[in-house]
Amino acid sequence: LRRDEEVSLTILSKICKTLHADFGDIVEYVPDAEIWDLYNENRELLGKDHIRGEQLPIDGYHLVVHVWIRNSKGEYLISQRSANRPTYPLMWECVGGSVVKGEDSLQGAIREAKEEVGVDLIPENGQVLFTKTRKIIDGKIYNDIMDVWLFEYDGEVDLGNATTDEVAQVAWMNREQIKELFEHNIFVETLEYFFTEVDKERR
């Protein structure tokens, strides 16, 4: 397969299964393919790969990170999703995304921060606040293990250093300002745990 061929990843996966080929050897030739490691419910690696966009197996989970970045003023770095995002366009959120094949949760959190908002987080300045396993939501197999990170960061923020175009703009906001965004329904609603689990000491 040539790199410039537009081949469906789903079809590739089926071809691999039919030919008993190693998917990793083939998918590397397909641009922009995001591959995840699969885990069981106990967070043990299954030794299987999964293509983003395909239906997850009922017994397979992937790692997801939410990354809250806080400065010494108690403000949080939040971002507005680009208008071309397929879900929640132009809504506000924290940094976040899926951990890709070969990464651990910390590596995924640091990569996502660089990709989305252009900041270089220091591993020692981060901590996992809590972990949640999400299964079936509204009849859909969700199957992820979500780590919620909090990083302390007082450095510069320049969206020009981001490596993707997923974010339209960024801002430092305090609890009350974030609450106002929620009240106007322009903050991703699944992040409402912020008030009880992330900024809980400021209640």
Where are the predicted features?
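Recognition helix of helix-turn-helix/homeodomain-like DNA-binding domains
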Residues: 1-7
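DNA major-groove recognition helix of helix-turn-helix/homeodomain DNA-binding modules
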Residues: 10-25
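Short amphipathic recognition helices of helix-turn-helix/homeodomain-type DNA-binding modules
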Residues: 25-32
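Phosphate-coordinating loops and pocket residues in cytosolic domains that bind phosphorylated ligands
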Residues: 28, 110, 180
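Acidic, metal-coordinating catalytic segment for phosphate/diphosphate chemistry
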Residues: 32-66, 70-72
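Nudix hydrolase/Nudix homology domain
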Residues: 53, 130-203
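A glycine-rich, hydrophobic loop/mini-helix early in the fold
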Residues: 64-96
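The catalytic Nudix box helix
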Residues: 77-78, 94-128
